[in-house]
Regions:
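Cleavable N-terminal export/targeting peptides
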Residues: 1-25, 327-341
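N-terminal, post-signal peptide beta-strand-biased segments of exported outer-membrane/organellar beta-barrel
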Residues: 20-87, 322-324
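Outer-membrane pore/translocation modules
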Residues: 31, 114-225, 234, 330, ...
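Membrane-embedded beta-strand positions of outer-membrane beta-barrel proteins
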Residues: 39, 51-53, 88-90, 111, ...
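Short loop/turn motifs that connect adjacent beta-strands in outer-membrane beta-barrel proteins
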Residues: 41-48, 78-85, 99, 116-122, ...
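Transmembrane beta-strands of outer-membrane beta-barrel pores
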Residues: 55-59, 75-77, 92-96, 128-134, ...
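Outer membrane beta-barrel transmembrane domains
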Residues: 209-210, 214-341
Length: 341
């Protein structure tokens, strides 16, 4: 496959999807992945509340970059029954897709709860909100606009597509479940289940009717406590929607540092692979970061290994993530004054 064929394939796969139900946003940092796909599992964090921001930039080596940004907030609420906690939060994702100038805004809220029984934690969550899509077709070219005389695309030629509108919005509903279990001193394991787009809303810029297919995701994760300073965290996240799929698997190494000898508390390094049904590895993901006080700062880089590697020169995308976790407040000891006689 030569360079021009690779670029053409990229255009068909990404820009063409703007007219149907565009490919869902995906993240390389495992925390951002859960914030988007399973807030039930994401609610297992140790703390009172959590806020996160992430920024992803990809395909800059081929065309106008695809940019995805997200803001996330999750807050826990205590009940009289200490085994039960409620949680609620917000998620905003904006995805801007290259030359098609397709902008997707997700405004989502979630509510749910967690229940602790012995060494088990169970969580359930409902996520709902509005998804808005806007398309600017001024810079978009279709296969029918290829001009053989010039060897390029001509926007003045008919594209063969009838746009009904350049903006749309719909209500979205997602459900997620989570389970976590402290098996022994060495192992903690967990799993999650996600069902997305339950309403299968209409979302097409064309005159045709195209429903968003329902998506189902499964998450498997664990923590192996090597010793008091080192942990290994393997994951396997799988998500499938109609004929598309995304499987993310790999492992993260986390190491605690002596707080008196370093300006941060710990660092972590991870390596992951992203694959799809019937294809080889789509991308190799290398990531890492540090934790200091209540902050977790991380970055991940995608090395493109798909059929588009010739056009992209193996450069996929880079993602930056910042998480703040509000710690559990400890009770202050109050000295009760007494009178002296």
């Amino acid at each position: 496959m030569n360079f021009h064929q690779s670029v053409s394939l990229l255009i068909v796969c990404f820009f063409g999807s703007a007219f149907l139900y565009a490919q869902e946003e995906h993240f390389s940092n495992k925390e951002s992945y859960l914030f988007q796909r399973n807030t039930a599992v994401a609610s297992f964090f140790e703390g009172e509340w959590q806020a996160s921001s992430a920024h992803r930039r990809q395909w800059a080596s081929v065309t106008v970059p695809f940019i995805t940004s997200t803001l996330y907030l999750n807050k826990k609420f205590h009940l009289s029954n200490r085994a039960v906690k409620l949680h609620a939060g917000l998620l905003y994702i904006q995805d801007q897709s290259g030359d098609a100038e397709l902008t997707i805004d997700n405004f989502l809220a979630h509510v749910g709860g967690t229940y602790r029984y012995l060494q088990h934690q169970f969580s359930a969550n409902t996520q709902f909100g509005i998804v808005s899509k806007q398309l600017s077709d001024g810079n978009l070219t279709m296969p029918g606009q290829f001009d053989r005389e010039t060897g390029g695309f001509n926007i003045n030629l008919p594209g063969g597509e009838n746009l009904e509108s350049t903006s749309l919005s719909f209500f979205d509903l997602n459900l997620s479940l989570g389970w976590q279990y402290r098996w022994n001193q060495k192992w903690q394991v967990g799993s999650g289940l996600t069902v997305r787009h339950l309403l299968q809303s209409e979302a097409s810029f064309l005159e045709e009717n195209n429903q968003i297919p329902m998506g189902v995701g499964v998450q498997l994760f664990a923590t192996y406590f090597v010793n008091h300073k080192n942990r290994l965290k393997p994951i396997l996240y799988d998500y499938r929607r109609k004929k598309s799929s995304e499987t993310l698997f790999g492992v993260e190494w986390e190491h605690d540092l002596d707080q008196y000898k370093a300006f941060f508390d710990r660092f972590y390094l991870g390596a992951y692979s992203r694959q799809a049904i019937g294809s080889n590895t789509d991308a190799l993901i290398l990531g890492g970061g540090i934790e200091f006080n209540a902050f977790r700062l991380g970055a991940a880089y995608d090395i493109n290994l798909s059929d588009l590697d010739l056009a992209s020169e193996n450069r996929g995308g880079i993602e930056i993530q910042l998480i703040y976790t509000g710690k559990i407040r400890s009770l202050k000891k109050i000295a009760i004054p007494c009178e002296h006689y």
